[in-house]
Structures are given as structure tokens and as C-alpha cells.
């Protein structure tokens, strides 16, 4: 997404950001006659984690017990229930820190790690029961054809939470094969079927 140049006065930043966003999204409409593997609206929807969870259920995949909320009382009750839990932001985010780029990852969360209520209420988050993984699969669908890789996340540093944390340790990946029972539903055009990250 385009960012507002630092030269812009603080009073004008919101307006400039709106203009940049409008131009960015309108730009896609200039290529209506082009062949898209993923049309803009589908690619955008694919980045929405709530949409991904709904799509997973639609095609018959099981998802962990999930709470999406910014209500501190609900969040604390969920985290204090039986089992281990994780937190995911609704979107990915990159930022500069001490001269290097870092990003958001899935994180383990406990009642002790939760911030004060005012911070919990500031923005919604995705809270889920932690599911032990044998491996993770990254799948790309192109119509009825799919290609995927099996990531042995349990061998990676931090891989029990998010394979990307230790992705530098990946030497090779085997092909991922999906169960035949899920293929008819997963190969249908769902509007945002660019890729499906499936935890197994």
C-alpha cells in the first residue's frame, strides 16, 4: 500500500492517505480486460484472516476454537480456559526496529502475557486454542489444479507457533497431498482461493 510522504503536514496526512488509497485501488480497474489469475477483489479478500477461516469451514476443514474480539472480559475468559492459546493479528505488519525489518507472527498467549484492558480494547485480535501440528502445508489452487509444499514446522525454531519464524532453517520441502474428500470443495472458485494455509 502507498504511504504518505513525510513532507506532508500532519493536518493533511489523512486526506493524502485517502487519495493514495483511492488511486491504488482504482488502478486495478484500468486492467479489466487483462487475464488475472487473481482479480484484485479476490486477492484482497485472500489477505483477510477472518475470511480465510470462513472459507476453511466452507470447504470442510476443521478450525481451532476461535475468538475474534477486543472485549477484555471475553478475551481473558477465553485465554483462562483449558489448554494453550495463541494470538494472531487480523493483518500482517512490517516495521523497522534497530536497523532491521521485523514482522508480526503468531504468538503464544497466557493470562499473564495479556496487556492492560485499555490496550486489549484498542483493536480486535484472533485468539485460538493452540493445535499441535505434524506439519504445515502451503497450497496454491489454479482452477482444479493445485500445487503445494509440506513444511516440517516442528523442526524449525518457533515452528510450533509460526513456520515463518524459523523459515531460514528450511532446506527442502516435500510435496503436499490433500485428502481427496476435500478436493471437490477446495477446487471450486470461492472468490478468494489464491492460497490456503492448512495446518495438519
Q: Which residues fall in each region the model found?
A:
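Phosphate-interacting basic helix/loop segments used at nucleotide- and nucleic-acid interfaces
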Residues: 68
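Short, conserved beta-strand/beta-arch hydrophobic-aromatic motifs that form part
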Residues: 71
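Short, solvent-exposed loop/turn segments at secondary-structure junctions
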Residues: 2, 42-43, 92-93, 132-133, ...
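A long amphipathic alpha-helix within ATP-dependent nucleotide-binding catalytic cores
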Residues: 121-124, 129-130, 141, 158-200
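ATP-grasp fold ATP-binding core
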Residues: 53-57, 64, 75, 79-97, ...
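Beta-strand scaffold of nucleotide-dependent catalytic cores
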Residues: 86-89, 128, 136-153
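Conserved N-proximal alpha/beta basic substrate-recognition cap immediately N-terminal to
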Residues: 1-62
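Active-site loop ensemble at the mouth of alpha/beta enzyme cores that anchors a bound cofactor
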Residues: 97-114
